[in-house]
Amino acid sequence: NKKLINTVYNYKPDLLIYGHADLIKNSTLSYLKDNYKNLKIAQWFLDPLIKNGPDYFKNKSRILDKMEFTDANFITTSPDALNFLPKEKKCLFMPNPTDPSFEVLNNYENNHCSMDVFFALSHGVHRGILKKGKYDERADFVNRLVELTPNVKFDLYGIDNVQPIWADSFIKAISNSKMGVNLSRGEPIKYYSSDRITQLIGNGLLTFIHKN
């Protein structure tokens, strides 16, 4: 919190954007608002806000926690699908972004892919291994898809004790597939998708998502 206050003091920014800023106290944002009248504060929120989805109450609490100090909130779910957002606060939809410095592949130009369809899931962001005994309905869907399409070559991770992959290993894996499946946890909600969709589409894979 002291580092943030010192940074604002040194640079006098016009805009402060935060996301997953659990370590930043409300009192810090209040201080900045009081002492830098031209400072605008915005929140970027990319986690699921699905009632029957993963971590709903935790994510709901997190997005609301510092909203009293924000001038705008950018959310990867359509705000009109969320009935708990304060009406007086500016909340706007923002899709998960892609950037050519991260999404470096152009798989639509690759005529030598050894696999047809890529899919990966994990039990937590950058969690190296699967949790024992954890059930994920997406695995059922993908396994059924494999059964229905015996002539399709699937490259699957996070399913049937095949561990998740990250970073360079992830890029190398998707570089060998023509298509990708993007499945979000929980029931569909307007505009929301796992940010995996940007990694697949941004790297040039033909990408399949929920119909809803």
Question: What positions do the PLM features span?
Answer:
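Short, glycine/charge-rich beta-strand/loop segments that flank catalytic centers
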Residues: 22-23, 47
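Nucleotide-sugar donor-binding catalytic core of glycosyltransferases
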Residues: 1-3, 11, 20, 26-27, ...
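Glycosyltransferases and closely related glycan-assembly transferases
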Residues: 5-16, 26-41, 87
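Short secondary-structure transition/capping motifs
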Residues: 17-21, 52
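A short, histidine- and acid-enriched strand-loop-helix "catalytic/donor-clamping" loop
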Residues: 42-56
